[in-house]
C-alpha cells in the first residue's frame, strides 16, 4: 500500500471540511498593521485572535529597534548554531536580562518556542524517568512527552487529588531505579484561561521527589506584579525548577527561553538537539527582543491597560450571563452550550464577521466536547472601550439567534463574500 494513500480521503476533522471553507475559517488572511482592527476579506474587523497582549507588535520603539537591527545586520547574522559559530554578546545579554527578570540564576535562548519545549523534554528524561503532566497541556508539551521512551502519567486538569494519585504511581515506579520524576504543567492554560496550580504542586514536594517544568507562554508579561509570570503571581517562582516561555505572545516576536539553575542550563546548552544542530536566533530578533523586554520592564502602563480591558470585557460578558468558565487571566473563553453542529457554528462566525465586523477564534470538537462551541477572545493593551462595547452587544445578539435556531441549516455563502473582496 502506498504510504500516502491514507491521506486521500482522511485529512483530519478540520481538514475534511477544508474545501468548504478555504481562506475563511481555516488559513484566513488578516491584513494591514497589527492592531485592534485589521482588514479581513476587504472589510475592517475588530480582532480578538492575536496574542499581542501588551501591544508591542507595532510599538514605535519596537518597530525602530527591529528596523535598525535588520539594516545593520541583515537576517543571516550570526550564522550557525550557538555552540559552533552563532553566538554573540547580545545573545548572552538577552539571556542575562531574562534570567534577572524571572528571578532565576541563568537562562537559555531558544530559536523557536514550540520545538524548544519539545526538545527540552526529550533532553531532560531518559527511559528510566517518569513524566507526570496536566491533561490540558499545550501541544508542544504533548509532542515532547510522546518522544519519551519511559513511562508517563497524565493527571486531570488542575486536579490535585488526581495529581497525588499519579505521583504515587510514578514514585513507586522509580523507587530503587536510577530514574526520577519530571512534572510538567502550564502557568496559564491557553484555552481555558485557568492558571496552573503551581503553588499547590510545589507544596507536594514535601511529599514527593520531583522536578517542576512550567510552560508560562501566556503568563509571561501578563501575570505578576512586574509581569514575570504565573510564578510571581502565585508567589512560588522559587519552587519552579525550569521556567519556559515563548516570545510569540506578550513579546510579539519569535523565539523563546528556558530559565533555571546554571548547571541544568549548561547541560541543555551542550546537549539540546534543537539548539545544538540548528541556527541561532538571528540578530534582529535578539536586539528586537532586548527592546521588548526593556519595555516590558519599564512601562507598567502597558500591562495596566491590558488588565483594564480584561476586566471590562470579562465583567461585561458575565453581566450578560455568558459562561466564561473560571478564567483568572487575560485568556477569555466564551462557552455557548447546546448541541451545535457545523452549520450553526459556521453561520454564527460568518454573522459575527460579516454583520458585526468581529473576528475571533472559534473552538469546537475535537478540541472541546462534541456539540459545544467556544469563542476565544484575547484582549490586549491596544483594544479600546468601544471595541469591547461593540463586541458585547454583538455577542448578546448572536447568542439570541443561536438560542432561537435562527441560523439556516446550510453553510454560509462564503464564496460570494470572497469573490466580492477580490473585486
Question: Which residue ranges define each predicted feature?
Answer:
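Conserved PLP-binding catalytic core of the aspartate aminotransferase-like
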Residues: 26, 303-311, 318-356, 372, ...
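Structural motif of enzymes handling amino- and sulfur-group chemistry
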Residues: 280-299, 305, 309, 318-323
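N-terminal "arm"/small-domain region of PLP-dependent enzymes with the aminotransferase-like
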Residues: 8-76, 210
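Active-site PLP attachment segment
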Residues: 232-267
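Active-site phosphate-binding strand-loop segment of PLP-dependent enzymes
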Residues: 153, 157-214
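PLP-dependent enzyme catalytic core of the Aspartate aminotransferase-like
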Residues: 60, 68, 72, 96, ...
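Conserved PLP-anchoring active-site segment centered on the Schiff-base-forming lysine
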Residues: 120-139, 160
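Conserved N-terminal alpha-helix of the aminotransferase class I/II PLP-enzyme fold
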Residues: 64-112
Amino acid at each position: 500500500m502506498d504510504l500516502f494513500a491514507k491521506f486521500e480521503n482522511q485529512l483530519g476533522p478540520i481538514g475534511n471540511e477544508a474545501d468548504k471553507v478555504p481562506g475563511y475559517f481555516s488559513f484566513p488572511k488578516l491584513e494591514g498593521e497589527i492592531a485592534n482592527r485589521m482588514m479581513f476579506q476587504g472589510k475592517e474587523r475588530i480582532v480578538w485572535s492575536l496574542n499581542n497582549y501588551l501591544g508591542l507588535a507595532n510599538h514605535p520603539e519596537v518597530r525602530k529597534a527591529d528596523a535598525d537591527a535588520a539594516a545593520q545586520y541583515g537576517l543571516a547574522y550570526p550564522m550557525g548554531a550557538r555552540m559552533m559559530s552563532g553566538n554573540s554578546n547580545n545573545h548572552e545579554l538577552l539571556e542575562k536580562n531574562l534570567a534577572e527578570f524571572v528571578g532565576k540564576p541563568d537562562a537559555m535562548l531558544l530559536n523557536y518556542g514550540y520545538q524548544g519545549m519539545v526538545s527540552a523534554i526529550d533532553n531532560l528524561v531518559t527511559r528510566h524517568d517518569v513524566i507526570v503532566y496536566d491533561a490540558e497541556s499545550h501541544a508542544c508539551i504533548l509532542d515532547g512527552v510522546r518522544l519519551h521512551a519511559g513511562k508517563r502519567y497524565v493527571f486531570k486538569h488542575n486536579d490535585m487529588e488526581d495529581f497525588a494519585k499519579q505521583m504515587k504511581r510514578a514514585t513507586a515506579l522509580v523507587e530503587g531505579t536510577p530514574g526520577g520524576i519530571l512534572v510538567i504543567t502550564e502557568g496559564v492554560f491557553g484555552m481555558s484561561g485557568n492558571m496552573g496550580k503551581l503553588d499547590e504542586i510545589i507544596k507536594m514536594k514535601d511529599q514527593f521527589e520531583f522536578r517542576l517544568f512550567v510552560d508560562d507562554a501566556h503568563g509571561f508579561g501578563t501575570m505578576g506584579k512586574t509581569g514575570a509570570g504565573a510564578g510571581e503571581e502565585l508567589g512560588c517562582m522559587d519552587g519552579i525548577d525550569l521556567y519556559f516561555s515563548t516570545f510569540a505572545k506578550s513579546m510579539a516576536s519569535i523565539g523563546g527561553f528556558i530559565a533555571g539553575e546554571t548547571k541544568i542550563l549548561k547541560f541543555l546548552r551542550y546537549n539540546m538537539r534543537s539548539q545544538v544542530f540548528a541556527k541561532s536566533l538571528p540578530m534582529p530578533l535578539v536586539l528586537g527582543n532586548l527592546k521588548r523586554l526593556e519595555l516590558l520592564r519599564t512601562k507598567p502602563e502597558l500591562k495596566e491597560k491590558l488588565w483594564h480591558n480584561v476586566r471590562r470585557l470579562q465583567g461585561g460578558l458575565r453581566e450578560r450571563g455568558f459562561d466564561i468558565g473560571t478564567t483568572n487571566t487575560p485568556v477569555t473563553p466564551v462557552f455557548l452550550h447546546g448541541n451545535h453542529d457545523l452549520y450553526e457554528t459556521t453561520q454564527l462566525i460568518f454573522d459575527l464577521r460579516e454583520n458585526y465586523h468581529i473576528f475571533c477564534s472559534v473552538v469546537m470538537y475535537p478540541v472541546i466536547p462534541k456539540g459545544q462551541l467556544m469563542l476565544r477572545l484575547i484582549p490586549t493593551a491596544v483594544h479600546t472601550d468601544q471595541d469591547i462595547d461593540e463586541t458585547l452587544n454583538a455577542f448578546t445578539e448572536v447568542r439570541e439567534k443561536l438560542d432561537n435556531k435562527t441560523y439556516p441549516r446550510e453553510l454560509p455563502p462564503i464564496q460570494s463574500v470572497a469573490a466580492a473582496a477580490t473585486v
